[in-house]
Swiss-Prot record:
SUPFAM superfamilies: E set domains, Galactose mutarotase-like. It comes from Xylella fastidiosa (strain 9a5c). It is found in: Periplasm. The gene is opgD. Residues 1-36 form the signal peptide. Predicted to be exported by the Tat system. The position of the signal peptide cleavage has not been experimentally proven. One of its GO terms (molecular function) is catalytic activity. Coiled coil: none annotated. GO terms for cellular component: outer membrane-bounded periplasmic space. This is Glucans biosynthesis protein D.
């Protein structure tokens, strides 16, 4: 599906807003009686190798869209009406077994026009599951299920545990989007099966999962396995997901991709998030809440072992960055700031939003982690994307294999002995009480952890900030203990060259007297304001 990103994500983001809330049908509509879903056709032999061959054959044929014209009542649903449609607990897949997991399906309508075929896999045999209007309670939607087509199909699905049928721990809905939660039980950023031409000058392509194969778990299984068949105008693919629910939810993913055409920018393991306003960027800070973001930084563990933190921004125009690497060890969008007082939102709880860490299972070779930051005026638009882009462009006839793990939760599963950044603040530079002779911008970067706590309590210890900038000059540079956080604060002013508004890339870390690094590397990209704005200060 080809669309401009803002139009597509405006709809998909809205549809995820209420995820993670209790399902009202888990209460009054829950019964002990289980109604088995109707099956379609004959069962057929199934495994991942079969799915890969199916995807390869799909890529060899011309693409055709599966988007359909829905009945008018479904097309005209408001968000509140669509959200009131709930899948009945007594129709949940595997509710009639002793499996630890259950599946509930999403209805088509509103923004979701492409039916996704659903299959159950039992003992290596797959059989399609039939849509049944009676499996849904239509709430306040005004819909009459008896008047809907019997072959309408499903939009997606969510996963629950038998112990908690009211809350889902993962959901797959819209194009190739999916989300999951850790112990915080809060949805936030999302992942996708694939990104195509994200951040390019033309329309972005949003591949669709056109079919899912749900493998029935055994009674003692703590992992649920499912498969996805992906298709789009330029590429097809087969995916295997092994999902283990826990304090940090783990998705072990294998993907096999088959291009139909040469792709300019392929994004592997894309993460999608939202950043409107934060400590370092208050350009859109007119809201009463101090901070509004799902994540506050991109975290990288490079192939050569460097730990990098790049705070996110809400730029005035689309901004694209690439971080060249060879066999990256991991990357992800993190929500490091976990203090409710910094957000003050008791409705969506941004401090509980999950981090998402991508860990390659094998060498991915040369390429780059790419970061796209898009301007947004409000929190309903996901404007942050990160993904891995292989150096070589994919061509028709190739098979591209990528295996990786996704970790959803409060913190990534990796940690360093180095100190890490906990806050980046910016504001007007200069010396308080003295008239400014020129414009400068102040940065205050806080580091904690590692050896800093011990060093902060010792007098006459030299900790040196190492600061590099691509242009401009730095002044009033300091690094001093900040006992309130048991760490260090680095402060410096950046003075842009003349009236240039060209971006300035900043690189910073702390080292000891022996030249050994004490902190991760902090990266930032600052856009100096135009000359007229500088004169205002």
């Amino acid at each position: 599906m080809l669309m401009y990103r803002r139009d597509f994500l405006k709809s998909v983001t809205a549809a995820w807003v209420a995820f993670g809330l209790p399902n009202p049908l888990g209460g009054p509509f829950a019964t002990n009686r289980v109604i088995a879903l109707r099956r379609l056709g004959q069962s057929q032999r199934f495994d991942y190798e079969w799915l890969k061959e199916h995807a390869r054959a799909l890529a060899a044929a011309p693409y055709h869209s599966r988007k359909r014209v829905l009945p008018t009542p479904l097309e005209r649903l408001s968000w509140d009406q669509y959200q009131s449609i709930r899948y009945r607990q007594d129709h949940a897949l595997w509710a009639d077994s002793d499996a630890h997991f259950q599946v509930k399906f999403f209805h088509l309508g509103l923004y979701f026009h492409s039916p996704v075929r659903m299959y159950e896999v039992v003992d290596g045999m797959a059989q399609e599951l039939a849509y049944d209007p009676a499996a849904f309670d239509y709430g306040s939607s005004g819909l009459n299920g008896k008047r809907l087509p019997k072959d309408l199909g499903f939009a997606g699905f969510r996963l629950n545990t038998r112990k908690d049928t009211d809350r889902d721990f993962a959901a797959f809905l819209g194009a190739s989007y999916f989300r999951a939660v850790g112990q915080e039980g809060q949805y936030g950023q999302s992942a996708r099966g694939l990104a195509v031409n994200t951040g390019s000058s033309g329309p972005e392509e949003f591949p669709d999962f056109i079919a899912y194969y749900l493998e029935q778990p055994t009674s003692d299984a703590d992992t649920v396995v499912l498969y996805g068949l992906l298709d789009s105008p330029s590429i097809a693919g087969a995916y295997r997901f092994s999902i283990t629910n826990g304090d940090v939810l783990l998705m072990d993913i294998d993907s096999a991709l088959y291009p139909r055409e040469t792709i300019e920018r392929l994004g592997i393991a894309p993460c999608t998030s939202m950043y409107q306003v934060g400590e370092n960027d208050r350009r859109m800070g007119w809201d009463w809440r101090p901070e509004i973001h799902d994540t506050d930084g991109l975290f990288l563990l490079t192939g050569n072992g460097e730990w990098i933190w790049r705070p996110l921004c809400n730029p005035p125009y689309l901004r694209f960055n690439m971080f060249l690497d060879n066999n990256p060890r991991g990357f992800g969008l993190l929500q490091r700031d976990r203090d409710f007082d910094h957000y003050q939102d008791d409705g969506v709880f941004y401090e509980k939003r999950p981090c998402l860490w991508v860990e390659p299972k094998h060498g991915w070779g040369e390429g780059s982690v790419q970061l796209v930051e898009i301007p947004t005026f409000d929190e309903t638009f996901d404007n942050i994307v990160s993904f891995w882009n292989p150096r070589n462009k994919p061509h028709p006839g190739q098979e591209l294999l990528f295996g990786y793990r996704l970790y959803w939760g409060g913190l990534p599963p990796v940690s360093s002995s180095l100190a890490y950044c906990v806050a980046t603040r910016t504001g007007l530079g200069g010396v308080v009480g003295q008239k400014r002779k020129y414009f400068s911008w102040r940065f205050a970067v806080d580091f904690v952890g590692g050896k800093l706590a011990a060093l902060a309590s010792v007098h006459d210890v030299s900790v040196e900030p190492v600061l590099h900038m691509t242009r401009g000059r730095a002044e009033i540079v300091s690094a001093r203990p900040l006992h309130e956080i048991r760490g260090y604060r680095v402060m410096f002013d950046v003075v842009p060259l003349e009236d240039s508004t060209q971006q300035i890339d900043i690189r910073l870390y702390l080292r000891d007297t022996n030249g050994e690094p004490l902190t991760e590397t902090w990266l930032y990209q600052w856009m100096p304001p135009i000359l007229e704005e500088r004169k205002m200060y």
